[in-house]
UniProtKB/Swiss-Prot annotation:
Reaction catalysed by this enzyme: a 2-demethylmenaquinol + S-adenosyl-L-methionine = a menaquinol + S-adenosyl-L-homocysteine + H(+); a 2-methoxy-6-(all-trans-polyprenyl)benzene-1,4-diol + S-adenosyl-L-methionine = a 5-methoxy-2-methyl-3-(all-trans-polyprenyl)benzene-1,4-diol + S-adenosyl-L-homocysteine + H(+)
EC number, UniProt record: 2.1.1.163, 2.1.1.201
Stated role: Methyltransferase required for the conversion of demethylmenaquinol (DMKH2) to menaquinol (MKH2) and the conversion of 2-polyprenyl-6-methoxy-1,4-benzoquinol (DDMQH2) to 2-polyprenyl-3-methyl-6-methoxy-1,4-benzoquinol (DMQH2).
Main enzyme class: transferase
Gene Ontology terms for molecular function: 2-methoxy-6-polyprenyl-1,4-benzoquinol methyltransferase activity; demethylmenaquinone methyltransferase activity
Domain of life: Bacteria
Family: Belongs to the class I-like SAM-binding methyltransferase superfamily. MenG/UbiE family.
Keywords: Menaquinone biosynthesis, Methyltransferase, S-adenosyl-L-methionine, Transferase, Ubiquinone biosynthesis
Keyword Oxidoreductase in record: no
Organism from which the protein derives: Brucella canis (strain ATCC 23365 / NCTC 10854 / RM-666)
Pathway field: Quinol/quinone metabolism; menaquinone biosynthesis; menaquinol from 1,4-dihydroxy-2-naphthoate: step 2/2; Cofactor biosynthesis; ubiquinone biosynthesis
Protein name: Ubiquinone/menaquinone biosynthesis C-methyltransferase UbiE
Length: 269
């Protein structure tokens, strides 16, 4: 049950979705029909696509850039020709660009996103960076990937899986399209585990982020949804259990900045 803390709607751990799932019925704190959720999420990202980096800066106080660097460092992309990665919900290219550059421009990355506006931003950025030859852009649903079994050496998703209505389906699809020996990595906002930081981050999230979002983009509602969706997402241990249930082995996670974000890893063995 949500607790009132001044004007801050603070969500306790009991309000988070557990390992059994349930994100398909929530749009932030609002209960919705699961058939509505994807359309509502799409509307949010159509609105914020051109300001996506600003959005992530607001959500993470600029730390998302450090976390993404750490994600790709832990992935350790191969520098051998032919190594392939699928970056899901990766429209603007932040993770894919890092993978290509760390691999010495040997990796080929498929960027998949359900939102065409996000992909458009990513394609423009890729051309400006001179990375377009290493990339493919695909508009499709994470729950129904348009690829053959055992297609990719790695699967990454950053700040995207909490927006997928059926997380279990997305995880099953990730497992299916990875080659044996392939690696799954997911970076997502998570449960802050330091009590003082928890309170500070709640104040920042619920008071400041929507207001700043409105000043910069004229849209407070999208930022409110994004904050609320973080508080509904499963905590670290529960999400790890979901990854294991999808078939992955050697599942582990690392907290960043006291648990503001967590990086989960699993292997298809």
């Amino acid at each position: 049950m949500s607790q009132q803390n001044g004007n801050v709607n603070r969500v306790g751990a009991q309000d988070r979705v557990g390992a059994s799932g349930g994100m398909e019925h929530s749009f932030g704190f609002k209960a919705v029909d699961e058939n509505e959720k994807q359309g509502l999420v799409n509307d949010v990202f159509h609105k914020v696509a051109k300001r996506y980096d600003i959005m992530n800066d607001l959500m993470s106080a600029g730390m998302h850039r450090v976390w993404k660097d750490a994600m790709v460092a832990w992935l350790a992309p191969s520098k051998r020709p032919g190594w392939t990665s699928l970056d899901v919900a990766g429209g603007t290219g932040d993770i894919a660009f890092r993978i290509v550059e760390v691999s010495g421009r040997q990796a080929h990355v498929t960027i998949l996103d359900i939102n065409g506006s996000m992909l458009g931003v990513g394609r423009e950025r890729a051309i400006k960076k001179g990375l377009i030859d290493n990339l493919e852009f695909v508009e499709a649903n994470a729950e129904e990937l348009p690829f053959e079994d055992n297609s990719f050496d790695a699967y990454t998703i950053a700040f995207g899986i909490r927006n997928v209505p059926h997380i279990d389906k997305a995880l099953s699809e990730a497992y299916r399209v990875l080659k044996p020996g392939g690696r799954f990595l997911c970076l997502e906002f998570s449960e802050v585990e330091l009590p003082v930081l928890d309170k500070v981050y709640d104040e920042w999230s619920f008071r400041a982020i929507p207001r700043i979002g409105k000043m910069i983009t004229g849209d407070a509602d999208s930022y409110s949804y994004l904050v609320e969706s973080i508080r509904k997402f499963p905590k670290q241990q529960d999400f790890a259990a979901m990854i294991e249930k999808a078939g992955f082995e050697r599942v582990s996670y690392r907290n960043f900045t006291g648990g503001i974000a967590a990086l989960h890893s699993g292997w298809k063995l």
